[in-house]
């Protein structure tokens, strides 16, 4: 997972309704609503995100001979995400309307998504002292984060990427 949380108020907005800050033209919404300060990304209030990911991988493995084995795992994925304080980006979103009436960008609490993938693996003993392993996991196509469709490319898409793994085990001495 990933979690960040920063306090708001690092950038002064001057008098309410007066456009005179480093965030000028970036976040007119906060000035219009009477904000007196911004966070580091020209939004209002605290700034942060929270992403949690869980992958369940029930595995079937079998030896194909005395030195090699193969495994397969269906992957079941679950994600939870929330963002806060990103209202400074509202002007850059594809959603029409004002931030107050059409918010699929920030401050919506937790949203979740799920998806599926596959992992294949191999392990082989090359000698009495060297064993290699390799695995490949497909991209996990996840359902979209509908509450944050203006934040992510693909209107809320946040897939888990494919990945490759390699490993080597070396037995330094027969005593180990």
Predicted ranges, named:
Residues 1-176:
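Outer-membrane beta-barrel porins/channels
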């Amino acid at each position: 997972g990933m979690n960040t949380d920063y306090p708001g108020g690092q950038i002064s907005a001057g008098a309410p309704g007066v456009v005179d800050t480093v965030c000028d033209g970036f976040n007119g919404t906060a000035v219009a609503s009477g904000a007196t300060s911004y966070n580091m990304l020209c939004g209002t209030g605290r700034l942060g995100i929270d992403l949690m990911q869980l992958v369940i991988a029930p595995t079937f493995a079998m030896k194909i001979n005395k030195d090699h084995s193969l495994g397969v795992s269906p992957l079941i994925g679950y994600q939870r995400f929330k963002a806060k304080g990103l209202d400074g980006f509202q002007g850059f979103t594809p959603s029409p309307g004002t931030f107050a009436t059409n918010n699929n960008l920030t401050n919506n609490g937790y949203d979740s998504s799920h998806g599926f993938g596959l992992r294949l693996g191999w392990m082989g003993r090359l000698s009495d002292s060297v064993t290699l392993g390799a695995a490949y996991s497909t991209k996990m196509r996840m359902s979209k984060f509908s509450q944050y469709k203006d934040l992510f490319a693909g209107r809320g898409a946040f897939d888990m990427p494919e990945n490759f793994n390699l490993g080597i085990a070396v037995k330094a001495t027969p005593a180990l």
